[in-house]
Amino acid sequence: MSITAERKQALVAEYANKAGDTGSPEVQIAVLSERISNLTNHFKFHKKDNHSRRGLLKMVSQRRRLLDYLKEIDQNRYHTLIKKLGLRR
């Protein structure tokens, strides 16, 4: 359900604005999207896992807030990110 350290480092390297940048909205959104994707696959086999579903909803809300923040501060970065991640909107 969680992502491996190697995958997380790859996401950070791909979406970071500079080396070692783990706090930028782009990186946080990319990591959350990966975790959301993993949990979505988990629910295909474990439909009654409501405890994890609550965590999924929390992650989706957090990603939504980060996307709204990014859109507010820089719309070009926002549009580039959602296109790169393949998110609707």
Curated annotation (Swiss-Prot):
Signal sequence extent: none
UniProt keyword Ribonucleoprotein, yes or no: yes
Pfam families given in the database record: Ribosomal_S15 (PF00312)
Gene name per UniProt: rpsO
InterPro entries for the chain: Ribosomal_uS15, Ribosomal_uS15_bac-type, uS15_NS1_RNA-bd_sf
GO BP annotation list: translation
One cellular component (GO) term of this entry: cytosolic small ribosomal subunit
Record-linked CDD domains: Ribosomal_S15p_S13e
Similarity section: Belongs to the universal ribosomal protein uS15 family.
Subunit structure as annotated in this protein's UniProt entry: Part of the 30S ribosomal subunit. Forms a bridge to the 50S subunit in the 70S ribosome, contacting the 23S rRNA.
Protein name stated in the entry: Small ribosomal subunit protein uS15
Role, per record: One of the primary rRNA binding proteins, it binds directly to 16S rRNA where it helps nucleate assembly of the platform of the 30S subunit by binding and bridging several RNA helices of the 16S rRNA.
Record keywords: Ribonucleoprotein, Ribosomal protein, RNA-binding, rRNA-binding
GO molecular function: rRNA binding; structural constituent of ribosome
